[in-house]
UniProtKB/Swiss-Prot annotation:
<dbReference type="GO" id="GO:0015940">
    <property type="term" value="P:pantothenate biosynthetic process"/>
</dbReference>
<dbReference type="Pfam" id="PF02261">
    <property type="entry name" value="Asp_decarbox"/>
</dbReference>
<protein>
    <recommendedName>
        <fullName>Aspartate 1-decarboxylase</fullName>
        <ecNumber>4.1.1.11</ecNumber>
    </recommendedName>
</protein>
<feature type="active site" description="Proton donor">
    <location>
        <position position="58"/>
    </location>
</feature>
<dbReference type="GO" id="GO:0005829">
    <property type="term" value="C:cytosol"/>
</dbReference>
<keyword id="KW-0865">Zymogen</keyword>
<keyword id="KW-0670">Pyruvate</keyword>
<keyword id="KW-0963">Cytoplasm</keyword>
<feature type="modified residue" description="Pyruvic acid (Ser)">
    <location>
        <position position="25"/>
    </location>
</feature>
<comment type="function">
    <text>Catalyzes the pyruvoyl-dependent decarboxylation of aspartate to produce beta-alanine.</text>
</comment>
<keyword id="KW-0068">Autocatalytic cleavage</keyword>
<feature type="binding site">
    <location>
        <begin position="73"/>
        <end position="75"/>
    </location>
    <ligand>
        <name>substrate</name>
    </ligand>
</feature>
<dbReference type="InterPro" id="IPR003190">
    <property type="entry name" value="Asp_decarbox"/>
</dbReference>
<dbReference type="GO" id="GO:0004068">
    <property type="term" value="F:aspartate 1-decarboxylase activity"/>
</dbReference>
<keyword id="KW-0704">Schiff base</keyword>
<keyword id="KW-0456">Lyase</keyword>
<comment type="pathway">
    <text>Cofactor biosynthesis; (R)-pantothenate biosynthesis; beta-alanine from L-aspartate: step 1/1.</text>
</comment>
Amino acid sequence: MFITLMKSKIHRATVTEANLDYVGSITIDEDLMEAADIMENEKVQVVDNNNGNRFETYVIKGERGSGMICLNGAAARLVHPGDLIIIISYGIFDREEAKTFNPKVVFVDEKNKIINIKSEEKHGEI
């Protein structure tokens, strides 16, 4: 049996752009993708802290070091520039691997620059 776990997340990233006319996806600064172990075209869940929207999309690379977090296509209607979002990736693990797996949690500042990376999440800690 397999179990789906959070593989990584980028916590409280600031939306820099929402581009309705693009084909679709979320564009993420390549530095953030690397830090969170998220691949191009990987499916992610996006949670908007400002309005409560949750949706899935796929990732495309943004310019390294730019801080870019841009929602494209239909997803652009679900967020606004300046919103704080959480970008979550998931992995499928067998139960033995799941017992020892440690996710990556990437914390960013208001300009989407990495300020900390942790391998666990505890209630009440940011």
